[in-house]
């Protein structure tokens, strides 16, 4: 399916771009692989995408037109029907929060500033990618990136934001055989637990939760 994603990017991107594909044959994990690819990237901006996504026409130039040095930006998210390679436009997801266990939840609301991002596709400057330590390998190999993105942005004076100028479809996997890990050994659980250990009583997180209307009573 990664091949179809690359083909889709090549069909719909309109600017000056390069596609770097991570084939994690040595099992170093998604964060480590992202860091390897980010170091190889030659542009000023990096867009991370999962290998099972499709994109709207000109998504790259439209996203870059909205970028600044304080933002992690994501296109409007919709489910992808991978069998037909078609986007289900009836379910649009633009707002995301993380709960008191630092697990992402989809929230109601339109595009704009958001507490965090779903994590399957987003754009950041290369400088902020490394300066904010977006893919912190101490959080484990995979998972928990929604809260990680929100924390990295907001606690470094930046923000997370979604936009309607571009959109993408993402395959939401449900069956055990579709996941890149054993469901009983979910590395994402380590990531969210570690984020909770580090930040649960951080006043900046409490203020962030208040900003997005999240109850802080379970954080204390």
Question: Where do the PLM segments sit?
Answer:
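Long, compositionally biased intrinsically disordered regions
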Residues: 219-220
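Catalytic cores of eukaryotic secretory-pathway lumenal/extracellular enzymes that build
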Residues: 1-216
